[in-house]
């Protein structure tokens, strides 16, 4: 099985997949905008509907909205406060939506970074941004699995499971911050290079 490299993802590979990546490069802007709109819609739905409902029912901040993590006591407090219906809602509504969101966010960040990074002579920043963006989705899905496992195992609270899920939440938040900053940095570099091209 052939493993796709980061260069191929951004359409800069010069091997067998040159034609495919060239087509991808031409449409990368459309992909960035399209996935961005879907991702933003899902995000707003989570913030103003599912996560808001979870917080209203429990009186506590949901796991997803705790960038600095949580311990076993905090996890148990939230799970107990949710009640049977609240825990079921977390699984059927929030986790379901958060299955789509990480993929859309990661696709948006990768497409945007690759779009802006096409003019950059040094591809290292672009590669790093793509890798970090992929990390966001991985940790977000690990977080989702951990939250689901905590709900399924309630009223038992596994300390290792809580710490593993909390670590995934922290890393997801950190990677998201870094990826957004890198996207802005690549965008600024793209703007400067574009301005340099139009100067006489």
What do these predicted regions represent?
Residues 7-18:
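Short, Lys/Arg-enriched N-terminal segments with co-localized hydrophobic residues
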Residues 20-28, 86-93, 118-128, 157-168:
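Membrane-interfacial loop-to-transmembrane-helix junctions in polytopic alpha-helical membrane proteins
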Residues 21-93, 155:
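Interfacial loop at the N-terminal end of multi-pass membrane proteins
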Residues 28-45, 93-114, 172-190:
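Hydrophobic alpha-helical transmembrane segments
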Residues 113-152:
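Hydrophobic alpha-helical transmembrane segments of integral membrane proteins
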Residues 136-185:
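Alpha-helical transmembrane segments of multi-pass integral membrane proteins
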Residues 188, 192-200:
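Short, charged juxtamembrane terminal tails flanking transmembrane helices
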């Amino acid at each position: 099985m052939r493993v796709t490299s980061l260069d191929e993802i951004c359409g800069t590979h010069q091997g067998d997949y040159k034609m495919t990546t060239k087509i991808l490069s031409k449409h990368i802007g459309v992909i960035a905008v399209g996935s961005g709109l879907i991702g933003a819609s899902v995000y707003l739905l989570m913030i103003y509907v599912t996560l808001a409902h979870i917080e209203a029912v429990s009186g506590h901040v949901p796991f997803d909205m705790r960038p600095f993590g949580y311990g076993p006591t905090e996890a148990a407090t939230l799970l107990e406060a949710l009640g049977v219906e609240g825990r079921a809602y977390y699984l059927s509504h929030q986790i379901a939506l958060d299955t789509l969101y990480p993929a859309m966010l990661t696709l948006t960040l990768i497409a945007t970074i690759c779009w802006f990074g096409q003019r950059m002579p040094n591809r290292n920043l672009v590669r790093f941004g793509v890798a970090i963006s992929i990390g966001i989705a991985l940790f977000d899905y690990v977080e989702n699995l951990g939250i689901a496992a905590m709900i399924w195992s309630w009223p038992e609270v596994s300390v290792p499971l809580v710490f593993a899920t909390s670590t995934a939440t922290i890393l997801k938040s950190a990677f998201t911050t870094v990826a957004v900053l890198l996207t802005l940095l690549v965008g600024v570099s793209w703007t400067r290079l574009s301005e340099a091209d139009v100067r006489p």
